[in-house]
Swiss-Prot record:
Stretch forming the signal peptide: 1-29
CDD domains cross-referenced by the UniProt entry: Peptidases_S8_Subtilisin_subset (cd07477)
Gene from which the chain derives: apr
Binding site for Ca(2+) 1: 108, 147, 181, 183, 185, 187
Native source organism of the sequence: Bacillus subtilis subsp. amylosacchariticus
One Pfam family named in its UniProt record: Inhibitor_I9
Reactions the enzyme catalyzes: Hydrolysis of proteins with broad specificity for peptide bonds, and a preference for a large uncharged residue in P1. Hydrolyzes peptide amides
Family from the record: Belongs to the peptidase S8 family.
UniProt-recorded name of the protein: Subtilisin amylosacchariticus
Cofactor: binding details: Binds 2 calcium ions per subunit.
Length: 381
């Protein structure tokens, strides 16, 4: 009898220990996952020769999980908990640890904007963007649209791997403003003969990690794009994002980015990133009367303006619709850059940018209007 009681007591004790251990493990796992976030870990330039395996080890040894190592940025995207972040910031090989922020699309029959920026003047001369490659870094492009010529692309959205499907419609709309075909249907783009490339970095909700955008820009560099359009942005800066944008520009690419839809806030800049970086052309929005759109972000970083109110363009499923936003203004600038390059293929990206800015039509205070409304006819002279 005593032996039976002893056995029951032992069994109960073992069960209790197992239950407590399991509960503790579960609590630890839950606690760890709840504090894990996405970060970008940058390594010091003196460590540029460090192997990919060694960089991965530095992060893994601190408990982090490497998601992606970049090609042109000496950094890696990783999932880290708070402890790993603190330890990595102390590591002598690490230059910075920054949150992998999320960017969003800036969204609100021949579109009036095409005439407003004087694109038809170049069309009549036979310049329509031929042999110019434009990367639309966005939510993808519906390549089945009969009014679009999509030549290639890639997706960096892990859950949406097809760059030719556009769940939010944003990228398809942007693409049409840049290069909708000169045919008997739909709308006309600024640069109808330009080659479009769908670089998907935003998901169907219109959001994307900065690391996805970095991957997209790296793809554009590696695939020798001439122009990058980024109708997206976020409120937070990023060393890694700035590095790759600067690399794109130093590689000869014209980079146009939406200034943002935050309106104005006194004397404070509301321009988002990456438009805020000096190497990009930051684009604000005006209406058909050249009045600044109330939603258009303002700041000293603003470079030029373009039409961005009630812009008619392509939508998925072979349809069309009108959107508002600096997202809609930016492709007018990207398309204009493609037009200029089709007329002057030997011009550098710096020359293209200088011409777009120096020939822009003055509209008012540069804090709100930058250099003014682009005039591609004058810019291409």
């Amino acid at each position: 009898m005593r032996s039976k009681k002893l056995w029951i007591s032992l069994l109960f004790a073992l069960t209790l220990i197992f239950t407590m251990a399991f509960s503790n493990m579960s609590a630890q796992a839950a606690g760890k996952s709840s504090t894990e976030k996405k970060y970008i870990v940058g390594f010091k330039q003196t460590m540029s020769a460090m192997s990919s395996a060694k960089k991965k080890d530095v992060i893994s040894e601190k408990g982090g999980k490497v998601q992606k190592q970049f090609k042109y940025v000496n950094a890696a995207a990783a999932t880290l908990d708070e402890k790993a972040v603190k330890e990595l910031k102390k590591d002598p090989s690490v230059a910075y640890v920054e949150e992998d922020h999320i960017a969003h699309e800036y969204a609100q029959s021949v579109p009036y904007g095409i005439s407003q920026i004087k694109a038809p003047a170049l069309h009549s001369q036979g310049y329509t963007g031929s042999n110019v490659k434009v990367a639309v870094i966005d939510s993808g492009i519906d390549s089945s649209h009969p009014d679009l010529n999509v030549r290639g692309g890639a997706s960096f959205v892990p859950s949406e791997t097809n760059p030719y499907q556009d769940g939010s419609s944003h990228g398809t709309h942007v693409a049409g403003t840049i290069a909708a075909l000169n045919n008997s249907i739909g709308v006309l783009g600024v640069s109808p003969s330009a080659s479009l490339y769908a670089v998907k970095v935003l998901d169907s909700t219109g959001s994307g990690q900065y690391s996805w955008i970095i991957n997209g820009i790296e793809w554009a560099i590696s695939n020798n794009m001439d122009v990058i359009n980024m109708s997206l942005g976020g409120p937070s800066g990023s060393t890694a994002l700035k590095t790759v944008v600067d690399k794109a520009v130093s590689s000869g690419i014209v980079v146009a980015a939406a200034a943002g839809n935050e309106g104005s806030s006194g004397s404070s800049s509301t321009v988002g990133y990456p438009a805020k970086y000096p190497s990009t052309i930051a684009v604000g929005a005006v209406n058909s009367s050249n009045q600044r759109a109330s939603f258009s972000s303002a700041g000293s970083e603003l470079d030029v303006m373009a039409p961005g109110v009630s812009i008619q363009s392509t939508l998925p499923g072979g349809t069309y619709g009108a959107y508002n936003g600096t997202s809609m203004a930016t492709p007018h600038v990207a398309g204009a850059a493609a037009l200029i390059l089709s007329k002057h293929p030997t011009w550098t990206n710096a020359q293209v940018r200088d011409r777009l800015e120096s020939t822009a039509t003055y509209l008012g205070n540069s804090f709100y209007y930058g250099k003014g409304l682009i005039n591609v006819q004058a810019a291409a002279q």
